[in-house]
Amino acid sequence: MSHKPAHLLLVDDDPGLLKLLGLRLTSEGYSVVTAESGAEGLRVLNREKVDLVISDLRMDEMDGMQLFAEIQKVQPGMPVIILTAHGSIPDAVAATQQGVFSFLTKPVDKDALYQAIDDALEQSAPATDERWREAIVTRSPLMLRLLEQARLVAQSDVSVLINGQSGTGKEIFAQAIHNASPRNSKPFIAINCGALPEQLLESELFGHARGAFTGAVSNREGLFQAAEGGTLFLDEIGDMPAPLQVKLLRVLQERKVRPLGSNRDIDINVRIISATHRDLPKAMARGEFREDLYYRLNVVSLKIPALAERTEDIPLLANHLLRQAAERHKPFVRAFSTDAMKRLMTASWPGNVRQLVNVIEQCVALTSSPVISDALVEQALEGENTALPTFVEARNQFELNYLRKLLQITKGNVTHAARMAGRNRTEFYKLLSRHELDANDFKE
């Protein structure tokens, strides 16, 4: 059974039953926090964002109905499910009349409980449509604030620059902004500006006329035209070659695009969202990124936190990704062991969510058990240390190694090294600056 990601508060003064129910719900993909009294449950609600409360009825000091009454004072819309071993039909009727969402008798049928949870979450969902952000699984206050900013920004057409480390989900975030915008019925088109050679990138963005270059056998519209009325997402904008930065600036200023080999301008109507993992102000200081283009793109800046900055999302994400991977490959896989989840929580995650996806895919591929073990997670994390980099990361590493080799061969002679690389001195110095290399370090 597949469930929407949700954060549940379980309240019961029986630690054994509390633990058992918590494990069962965690294995179903829910994020769970527990409390052994009504007072403790209220403290949890004060410090955490909870989607649903499940409480035992009979508890010392504050019973389930008293807890429900207190919850309604501070969070009136919070759905509450009451569990009891001593229930009766009049009790259930009275509870639901007071606003309790569901009143279930112990021992609780698991399917009835899961259905009650899903129904409660569905009914308590905000009136506004939240499907725009359904691909972003989070309960982190950092991310929730960022999503609220994104929702507000989406209503206008201002350019947005998304900053964040590789693997944090910048494209998914850009897609969410598009989904929340008035342009959501039009195309969302993404391109990685660092993954293509300059001429090919120019042709992809602006299109080309027949005969514009060898192989251009027909007219072809570019992505600016393909995204007409919608959103164009320029990923890794910091890696865009300087000549194309000039052309992009002109397009943004004039709202017109001229295909390669054409003398005709075409009006465009697109919203621009860009993203980078680079420090663009530093790139501007080194002369690698145009200041005027930066301010055109950076009307609103959003920074996605690294996964290590929102560890509270790891159980939620891990269970969500496990369900997806299991559905595709091994439906019998159900959960992580306690130690496996602890290891996921304490890992450093330099590759962020992308790395977490890879680790979980590997765990599901290799497990023969319904429960992912700690040893399997450890193995997958160690394997990630030798995992293939992305294309852009691999290209950057190649450039760095290549430049070092050139400078070693030429003993730091930039003129000679640039000639060997087939670049002029200005371009070569920019390459050295991008990779923070100093030719003087290679002179004998």
Curated annotation (Swiss-Prot):
Residues with the 4-aspartylphosphate modification: 56
For whether the record's keyword set contains Coiled coil, the answer is no
Q: Which Pfam families match?
A: Response_reg, Sigma54_activat
A GO cellular component annotation here is:
protein-DNA complex
Q: Which SUPFAM superfamilies match?
A: CheY-like, Homeodomain-like, P-loop containing nucleoside triphosphate hydrolases
Location in the cell reads: Cytoplasm
Signal peptide as annotated in the record:
none
Q: Which SMART domains match?
A: AAA, REC
Which terms does the UniProt entry file under GO BP?
DNA-templated transcription; phosphorelay signal transduction system; positive regulation of DNA-templated transcription
Identify a single GO molecular function assigned to this protein: DNA-binding transcription activator activity
Q: What does this protein do?
A: Member of the two-component regulatory system GlrR/GlrK that up-regulates transcription of the glmY sRNA when cells enter the stationary growth phase. Regulates glmY transcription by binding to three conserved sites in the purL-glmY intergenic region.
What NCBIfam families does this protein map onto?
PRK15115.1
Q: What is this protein called?
A: Transcriptional regulatory protein GlrR
Q: Which organism is it from?
A: Escherichia coli (strain K12)
